[in-house]
A protein has these predicted regions:
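Helix-boundary and N-terminal cytosolic regulatory elements
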Residues: 1-126, 154-156
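Extended amphipathic alpha-helical scaffolding segments in membrane-proximal extra-membrane regions
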Residues: 80-193
């Protein structure tokens, strides 16, 4: 799926992309590829001379592979963004490309940070001025989202601590406490990455 956004009076305006022709007519500041199809990848190549990285390229942990200028002069950045769900927390890899004053983003899952930024930028005039503002605000929003998730984990651990300090703890209660601690440690592990 492709979400394209134009900047109008300092606000993001979403343009529904249903065909290559519609994408070609837009004047985007941001094009967000959410689990793109092969056809959508081809549109990126044909319209923007942009070869979208494969998911295999996302996981490279070498510092030189996380941020670099490619052969076309585009800035390529690889990052992880937090996805905090009821089932637990995990990182989702995201690739960014800054080219021709457009931010291209590529990820395989919908991320709350992206939704939150889109909502803010639609409703607050002057919120963004260019693709650089957009990229920086995505990182700032991710830091805010991660901090909220971390606060939730610590609140859970505090509640677990209060339960364990009761005078009597049955074996069943102790098992629940240990399971809760393990779940929260998993969340802390993902938040720390």
């Amino acid at each position: 799926m492709i979400n394209s956004f134009e900047l109008q009076h300092g606000r993001l305006k979403q343009v529904q992309i249903e065909s290559k022709a519609v994408l070609e007519r837009t004047q985007p500041i941001w094009i967000d590829f959410d689990d793109p199809t092969d056809e959508e990848r081809l549109w990126a190549k044909e319209l923007f001379n942009l070869i979208l990285p494969d998911e295999d390229d996302f996981g490279d942990i070498e510092a030189s592979a996380r941020c670099f200028e490619d052969a076309t002069g585009a800035l390529q950045i690889r990052s992880d963004f937090l996805l905090d769900t009821a089932d637990g927390s995990r990182n989702v890899p995201v690739a960014f490309v800054l080219k021709r004053d457009i931010l291209f983003s590529l990820h395989e899952e919908d991320l709350p940070v992206f939704r939150l930024l889109r909502m803010r930028a639609r409703h607050q005039p002057g919120y963004l001025e260019d693709c650089w503002d957009l990229l920086l605000d995505l990182y700032a929003t991710d830091a805010e989202y991660s901090a909220d998730a971390l606060e939730g984990v610590y609140a859970n651990l505090e509640e677990i601590g209060n339960r364990t300090l009761r005078a009597y703890l049955s074996d069943e209660d102790a098992a629940e406490v240990l399971a809760s601690i393990a779940d929260n440690l998993d969340d802390l592990y993902f938040l720390g990455q």
